[in-house]
């Protein structure tokens, strides 16, 4: 842990890596050198940061397998992000949670589709009944005896007072 916080140690390791790369690659003006140095620096930093963190996590945690798995997945995801990939590595637990969420969403959508289908079937049946009621049927002779307005017709002689009760009469209003 002391060496992790020691800036001189970290700088000396970076200088050592740079000197090693310069000795391996004879051409100091090589175009890929800054990228290689950046990757090696990131790997070194991850190495120095992850080992003490994992040691502390393993000592304090009871389930060491999950901690190691989580640390490794986090490190791999960090490396993938640094490399420019948008994909991420997931554990089985995360995959199962996502699958459960997807299955719940699919069930909800299937129930909605079922309700909509039932409503559409009911609407089609209603439209069929309305269409059947609106179809005009040809009738040769119209039976007027069943018409409502033809039942109780009285002539002027059949009225009791001899006057048409529906005829308006004069009304005088006092002022």
From Swiss-Prot:
Domain of life: Viruses
UniProt-recorded Gene Ontology molecular function terms: channel activity; metal ion binding; toxin activity
Positions with a binding annotation for Ca(2+): 120, 123
An example Gene Ontology biological process: viral process
Glycosylation sites: 8, 18
Subcellular location: Host rough endoplasmic reticulum membrane; Host membrane, Host caveola; Secreted
Post-translational modification: The N-glycosyl content is primarily Man(9)GlcNAc, with a small amount of Man(8)GlcNAc.
Membrane topology, Cytoplasmic segments: 52-175
Protein family according to the UniProt entry: Belongs to the rotavirus NSP4 family.
InterPro entries the UniProt entry points to: Rotavirus_NSP4
Swiss-Prot/TrEMBL keywords: Activation of host autophagy by virus, Calcium, Enterotoxin, Glycoprotein, Host endoplasmic reticulum, Host membrane, Host-virus interaction, Ion channel, Ion transport, Membrane, Metal-binding, Secreted, Signal-anchor, Toxin, Transmembrane, Transmembrane helix, Transport, Viral ion channel, Virulence
A Pfam family of this chain: Rota_NSP4
Recorded domain comment: Binds 1 calcium ion per tetramer.
Entry membrane topology: Single-pass type III membrane protein
Listed name of the protein: Non-structural glycoprotein 4
GO annotations of cellular component type: extracellular region; host caveola; host cell rough endoplasmic reticulum membrane; membrane
Transmembrane residue ranges: 29-51
Topology Lumenal: residue spans: 1-28
Function, in words: Plays an essential role in the virus replication cycle by acting as a viroporin. Creates a pore in the host endoplasmic reticulum and as a consequence releases Ca(2+) in the cytoplasm of infected cell. In turn, high levels of cytoplasmic calcium trigger membrane trafficking and transport of viral ER-associated proteins to viroplasms, sites of viral genome replication and immature particle assembly. The secreted form acts as an enterotoxin that causes phospholipase C-dependent elevation of the intracellular calcium concentration in host intestinal mucosa cells. Increased concentration of intracellular calcium disrupts the cytoskeleton and the tight junctions, raising the paracellular permeability. Potentiates chloride ion secretion through a calcium ion-dependent signaling pathway, inducing age-dependent diarrhea.
Subunit annotation: Homotetramer. Interacts with the immature particle in the viroplasm. Interacts with host CAV1, early and late in infection. Interacts with host integrin ITGA1/ITGB1 heterodimer. Interacts with host integrin ITGA2/ITGB1 heterodimer. Interaction with microtubules blocks trafficking to the Golgi apparatus.
């Amino acid at each position: 842990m002391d060496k992790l916080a020691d800036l001189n140690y970290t700088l000396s390791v970076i200088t050592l890596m740079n000197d090693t790369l310069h000795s391996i690659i004879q051409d100091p003006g090589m175009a890929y050198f800054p990228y290689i140095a950046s990757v090696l620096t990131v790997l070194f930093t991850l190495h120095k940061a992850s080992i003490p963190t994992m040691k502390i996590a393993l000592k304090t945690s009871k389930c060491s397998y999950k901690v190691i798995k989580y640390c490794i997945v986090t490190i791999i995801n960090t490396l993938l992000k640094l490399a420019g990939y948008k994909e991420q590595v997931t554990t089985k637990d995360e995959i199962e949670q996502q699958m459960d969420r997807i299955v719940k969403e699919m069930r909800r959508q299937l129930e909605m589709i079922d309700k909509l289908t039932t409503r559409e079937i009911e609407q089609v049946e209603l439209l069929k009944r309305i269409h059947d009621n609106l179809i005009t049927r040809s009738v040769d002779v119209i039976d007027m005896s069943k018409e409502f307005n033809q039942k109780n017709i009285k002539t002027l002689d059949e009225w009791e007072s001899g006057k048409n009760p529906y005829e308006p009469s004069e009304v005088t209003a006092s002022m």
